[in-house]
């Protein structure tokens, strides 16, 4: 986290409290990680004295994080990435259920970004999108990559006539397989080509579209975050298997 510019570091207690309260209000998922594991959680409550974080879904992970000497927490919203570290967590209760309780961090990184890290969408089963062009024709595409800020898409046919950069689309339907179907507004940022060399040493060219999401609701944003976390975890697991 020290790789960020110091301008993104918040040390004022009121500023830190404000960021954490926004994460709590919008129920933004937290990725809690330590030397030997990670899980997804959320903030249950926060005040000037303490931060209360929900238990994870697996008991062994909850036990493991309590033994960790330092815990890193990352949250991503549509507008920024938040990162901070905490000392050893302590278990307690919130509304009669187990929870982690800790003092607020002494500092946190609040990094506003124009571009988001994009994670590759699965090749199988593929994720698909459908929207309507201004002339009422249907535009279908396959998701190539995904972030909170937008998505990359590949067309299975030629670029339709009249499709231009800057065009806006309302209620684009995204079929995310096991995650379900989502609807988002999006703007077409760029039209390009993806070129790959196949097994016959021939170049395969596929039209590629880059979209920016518009007016994403907090509920959809939370689900997108969960999908991205899951895809990141699967990518790491595949990489580990290759190394083994």
Curated annotation (Swiss-Prot):
Q: Which GO terms describe its cellular component?
A: bacterial-type flagellum basal body
Keywords, sorted A to Z: Bacterial flagellum, c-di-GMP, Nucleotide-binding
Please summarize what the entry says happens upon disruption of the gene. No visible motility phenotype. Disruption of this gene suppresses the reduced motility of a yhjH disruption, thus the double knockout is motile. Overexpression of this gene in a yhjH disruption has the converse effect, i.e. it reduces motility further.
Annotated PilZ domain ranges read 112-230
Q: Which Pfam families match?
A: PilZ, PilZN
Q: Cite a single GO BP annotation.
A: bacterial-type flagellum-dependent cell motility
Taxonomic superkingdom: Bacteria
> Is Nucleotide-binding there in the keyword field?
yes
Task: Give the stretches traversing the membrane.
Answer: none
**Location(s) in or outside the cell:** Bacterial flagellum basal body
Entry similarity comment: Belongs to the YcgR family.
Its biological purpose is as follows: Acts as a flagellar brake, regulating swimming and swarming in a bis-(3'-5') cyclic diguanylic acid (c-di-GMP)-dependent manner. Overexpression of this gene decreases swimming and swarming motility; those cells that are motile turn predominantly counterclockwise. Binds 1 c-di-GMP dimer per subunit.
Q: What is known of its domains?
A: The N-terminal domain is involved in FliG binding, the C-terminal domain is involved in FliM binding.
- Supply the name of the protein: Flagellar brake protein YcgR
Task: Report the source organism.
Answer: Salmonella typhimurium (strain LT2 / SGSC1412 / ATCC 700720)
Q: Which gene encodes it?
A: ycgR
């Amino acid at each position: 986290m020290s790789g960020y510019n110091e301008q993104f570091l918040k040390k004022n207690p009121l500023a830190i409290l404000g960021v954490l309260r926004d994460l709590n209000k919008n129920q933004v998922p937290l990725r809690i990680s330590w030397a030997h594991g990670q899980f997804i959680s959320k903030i249950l409550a926060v005040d000037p004295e303490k931060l209360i974080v929900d238990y994870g879904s697996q008991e062994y992970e909850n036990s493991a994080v309590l033994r960790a000497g330092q815990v890193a927490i990352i949250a991503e919203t549509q507008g920024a990435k938040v990162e901070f570290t905490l000392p050893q967590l302590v278990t307690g209760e919130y509304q009669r259920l187990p929870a982690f309780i800790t003092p607020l961090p002494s500092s946190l990184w609040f990094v506003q970004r124009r571009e988001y890290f994009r994670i590759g969408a699965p090749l199988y089963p593929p994720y698909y999108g459908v929207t309507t062009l201004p002339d009422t024709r249907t535009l279908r595409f396959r998701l190539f990559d995904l972030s909170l800020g937008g998505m990359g898409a590949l067309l299975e046919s030629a670029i339709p006539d009249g499709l231009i950069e800057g065009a806006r689309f309302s209620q684009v339907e995204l079929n995310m397989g096991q995650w379900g179907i989502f609807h988002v507004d999006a703007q077409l940022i760029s039209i390009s080509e993806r070129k790959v060399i196949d097994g016959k040493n021939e170049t395969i060219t596929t039209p590629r579209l880059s979209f920016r999401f518009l007016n994403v609701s907090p509920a959809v944003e939370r689900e997108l975050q969960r999908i991205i976390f899951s895809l990141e975890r699967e990518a790491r697991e595949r990489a580990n298997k290759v190394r083994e």
